[in-house]
A protein has these predicted regions:
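Double-stranded beta-helix
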Residues: 15-53, 189-212
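Transition-metal
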Residues: 36, 43-195
Length: 232
């Protein structure tokens, strides 16, 4: 798969010189859709011939209200710095895009205001989610803000195979983007060295597991990929 960024005002076209189908997904940013917002499909043998057009969906963008979590390790930045409206004294997480039953986003405005995100997805249908979601029976993405004022628990998330077999859930890869950080902030991701099962169990029991984890100092703008099965 390839992606191309096309700045405003740049002439461009899509051409296919092969006998195989090419799938192109065009994403535009703007308030309105006009006749210029079209994907034009050229005939490979005669580029000047009349072309087919595929018009973008004119449905409005659905703005969401987050679901909040009052985790004990949380702080107040999600409300005080980022302006999220929540009455919790401490906010650990703000689930901005979520169809997970443990905390669903809600439609923020318009005809479906107040509706749970999962209910809204049932109305608009799978086709509106893009071709990569067609084979899945639930919305697969969760986007959240985390305010970690204190250390979180050490965790390992399963992959799809294990999670579907044992929990009827999808596995969980994570991508962390550090929006802001205090001096000396760090994350744990993966083991710093090889360790036996017996050593890991012993360190879990005596609360020294972080001694063999990979400690990563972070600053605003850093990105960390945490694949399923990685201790963090």
């Amino acid at each position: 798969y390839e992606s191309v960024f096309i700045p405003v005002g740049t002439k461009h076209r899509i051409a296919n010189k092969t006998d195989k189908n090419v799938v192109v997904i065009e994403v535009g940013i703007g308030d309105n859709i006009s006749d210029t917002d079209l994907v034009k499909i050229y005939n490979k043998d005669n580029p000047q011939a009349s072309a087919n057009y595929v018009r973008l969906d004119k449905s409005p963008i659905a703005k969401l209200e987050p679901a909040f979590k009052d985790n004990l390790w949380g702080g107040t930045k999600i409300r005080d710095v980022y302006g999220k409206k929540c009455d919790y004294d401490v906010i650990g997480e703000s689930w901005e895009l979520s169809a997970h039953p443990d905390g669903q986003s809600r439609i923020a405005e318009g005809r479906y205001k107040g509706m749970l995100f999962n209910e809204y997805l049932n109305i608009i249908g799978k086709e509106a989610l893009g071709w990569k979601c067609q084979a899945q029976d639930r919305f697969p993405i969760l986007i959240k803000f985390i305010d970690a004022k204190q250390a979180l628990s050490i965790q390992i998330h399963p992959d799809d195979e294990y999670a579907l077999e044992n929990e009827n859930e999808y596995g969980k890869n994570e991508m962390w983007y550090v929006v802001d950080s205090e001096p000396g902030s760090y994350l744990y991701c993966g083991l710093s060295r090889d360790a036996s099962k017996e050593e890991i169990l012993e360190r879990i029991n005596n609360n020294t597991i972080t001694d063999i984890l990979n400690k990563i100092e972070v600053k605003a703008g850093d990105v960390v990929m945490v694949k399923a099965g990685t201790i963090h």
